[in-house]
């Protein structure tokens, strides 16, 4: 597959950052809390973010950049905007659990045009370019054929602040778990979506999201033939905070369960 300049660049820098994260994985980490005690940041997050931002500013100096750790906070209205999660799965990483990723998306005039998710521990690179399909290491991806929620394995996530949060996902989790074949919690939103695109997971839902959490993965799912909306069934935008992604075959069924929870 021949990708355009932006996508090839995103692939290169994602792999560079992933290599550095993997090299530091078994080191002792300086772990700090951000908004809550379970909202963590490590020196690896910050190193990866600074590396990615520096590479983008050198190559595309006029582009905006929006990052999880705050190194760069451009407006969502920027004509060209890079959305970066330099270490998706920080809690996993800090505990030595080998499930984390680097997630990069490029937005042009409000539309995500390329997305890259790199899983260093599994040596996997997921890539999507709008109109060109979703790919994993040269293999074209397609969502699963699970026809109904009862035959689907899904993944979800939970917010950092659970107590007193009406969107803590506990009601929704219980409602879906009683109807689905299985529900998993991997702790890495970008990889959840990549696995939906690959047909390994059949669906994913989560609230309290930021655009860098899901933008690359959402494009992967769409380009793999799946469906991505908000909880109300509207097509996603970079301002969406509650996301549902499926193979498209039982999407309305899942939305109905979430609404009824």
Which stretches of residues belong to each language-model region?
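Residue-level signal for inorganic ion chemistry
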Residues: 21-24, 45, 56, 90, ...
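A short, compositionally biased
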Residues: 27, 100, 128-132, 222, ...
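Short secondary-structure boundary/capping segments
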Residues: 32, 57, 72-75, 117, ...
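N-terminal subdomain of lithium-sensitive/metallo-dependent phosphomonoesterases centered on the IMPase/IPPase/PAP
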Residues: 1-87, 249, 256
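DPxDG-like acidic metal-binding loop motif
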Residues: 76-135
């Amino acid at each position: 597959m021949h990708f355009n300049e932006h996508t090839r660049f995103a692939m290169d820098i994602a792999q560079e950052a992933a290599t550095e994260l993997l090299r530091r994985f078994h080191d002792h980490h300086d772990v700090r809390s951000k908004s809550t005690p379970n909202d963590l940041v490590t020196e690896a997050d910050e190193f990866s973010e600074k590396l990615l931002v520096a590479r983008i500013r050198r190559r595309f100096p006029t582009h905006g950049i929006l990052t999880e750790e705050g190194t760069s906070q451009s407006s969502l209205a920027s004509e060209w905007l890079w959305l970066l999660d330099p270490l998706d799965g920080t809690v996993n990483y800090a505990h030595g659990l080998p499930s984390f990723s680097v997630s990069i998306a490029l937005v042009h005039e409000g539309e995500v045009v390329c997305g890259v998710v790199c899983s260093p521990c599994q040596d996997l690179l997921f890539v999507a370019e709008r109109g060109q399909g979703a790919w994993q290491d040269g293999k074209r991806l397609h969502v699963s054929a699970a026809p109904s929620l009862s035959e689907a394995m899904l993944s979800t996530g939970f917010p950092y602040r659970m107590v007193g949060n009406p969107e803590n996902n506990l009601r929704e989790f219980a409602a879906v778990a009683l109807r689905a074949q299985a529900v998993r919690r991997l702790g890495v939103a970008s990889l959840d979506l990549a696995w939906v695109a690959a047909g390994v997971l059949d669906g994913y839902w989560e609230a309290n999201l930021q655009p860098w959490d899901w933008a690359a993965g959402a494009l992967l799912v769409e380009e793999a033939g799946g469906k991505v909306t908000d909880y109300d069934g509207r097509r996603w935008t970079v301002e969406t905070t509650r996301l549902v992604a499926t193979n498209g075959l039982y999407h309305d069924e899942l939305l109905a369960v979430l609404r009824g929870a």
